[in-house]
């Protein structure tokens, strides 16, 4: 076959396969058999392999998955992916309607209602009609680049029907039938199953190997336009129509409503129809349809005033409580958990539910053998709502919390002003294991590849008992563990080695000193600069530090007044673990050339590692100016958790937005 004929045939096959994909995955109206589709796809793959010069990034063949990725790159959203406020009953919906009408002084507002798909929110970027990048929502400001995995979802067009530049937002999901099939395969292979379709979709999208994502049969509904160049669309409903015309899959069950009564009727209708859909929904999204009215209403500190998410009531089911199991956390708190006869709740099989503490068991008079009502708080965490007393037979057993720790048999105590029982034995194996899990966690030593499962394996093999033991691990020991090969063992040893270079605040937080969180650990590290200086500090010296109270100061002094702790610190030194502060002190910032010099910065939301007051001081010390509102003169917005209206203002004025992680990276350069 000549090159000219091959090129023509490749183009014919691409057009044909794109049409087949659109008919099947967007219109739900397939025109050919699977066998015919596969024959055409294999012919295309073969021709492209023989003629690589004709390969295209938007060829249908990329949907089978490509090269394995090393890591997901971070992506800062051009416009933040904000969350919505919630409504839980009819009264909440009527309150929303009242607020909207008061805000726009218009009794003729029209709403658009859409099914709230229970999946993974993503953004899709197109330039001149070609799909160039897709990203997860992340924290709303920064997500992860998952372009290659999204290309495997056939409901996402790789090329639009117009050469338009835009950003669309949507929800990637796994159909129920695909979820059932996937879990059956995992069970047959002896693998852990996914709890629900949402987790399955998220887990598939975040696979580093796109070929795995390609096999998972994901789909996607696009629910909105974040922006589009050279086009003004007056309403949300018209933007959805426009997206459909471009080739996107939009949900056909949307409806415009002229009154709140029509909205409520729509909610009630889909609450009944919900089980019959082939995908999970967890509520209804209600939006003011008119875009000009949306802009007039604006946003609150947390969410848009012009939209709300109605959450379906948590599904409640009845099952029997067969026992109560106890777990011991890293601080020694003993928590009771109900063991249940397996029951399906909100799409997953539930076998355990939280009981929180002894007082709750007494308050609800929960006994072993009781029939209880179980629901998922927020459709996520199973909990016991109440006992069905009419079903009692008299054979149920009252439960009494033990007097001794279930893990080490030490006597349990209830500290002053605390509800929980606590084990105070420092050598309790359960506390040690949970402490190790905390030590390697993201905000502490951040050792990649060392999570709860691996820590448990290492602990059970008696390879680790203290934090310092982690730094004595060998590749040979790891190779003795299940699921470890040469590459994974080498990578983990390297990750542990890399953690030795962490700044002091990470080590301090990882030690798990009572009352000392990530922010306080950073405060101590910056103030004392070395572990040795902190160890020598008195309670009075600690209390003299801004925002350090008496309880925390006492806790720190008590922690370091322990020979075992001092021995641990000595071992860290011998293994080469850094115990000095590597960040920048405010006093040192005056002479530093910085990005922030001459910049106007706005801080919004909750900053986890560094408080806003401390961040303000450091920016100002670097020559920057911190203001309370966003304007055209603002250079940067630093957004923490629960950032709200200032993000919308940043988008309006085209101001760059950073999350806390990006801010700290720049600050510590």
Curated annotation (Swiss-Prot):
Cofactor or coenzyme needed: Mg(2+); Mn(2+)
Keywords: DNA damage, DNA repair, DNA replication, Ligase, Magnesium, Manganese, Metal-binding, NAD, Zinc
InterPro entries: BRCT_dom (IPR001357), BRCT_dom_sf (IPR036420), DisA/LigA_HHH (IPR041663), DNA_ligase (IPR001679), DNA_ligase_AS (IPR018239), DNA_ligase_CS (IPR033136), DNAligase_adenylation (IPR013839), DNAligase_N (IPR013840)
Taxonomic superkingdom: Bacteria
Example GO BP: DNA replication
Binding, Zn(2+): 405, 408, 423, 428
Molecular function per GO: DNA binding; DNA ligase (NAD+) activity; metal ion binding
Stated name of the protein: DNA ligase
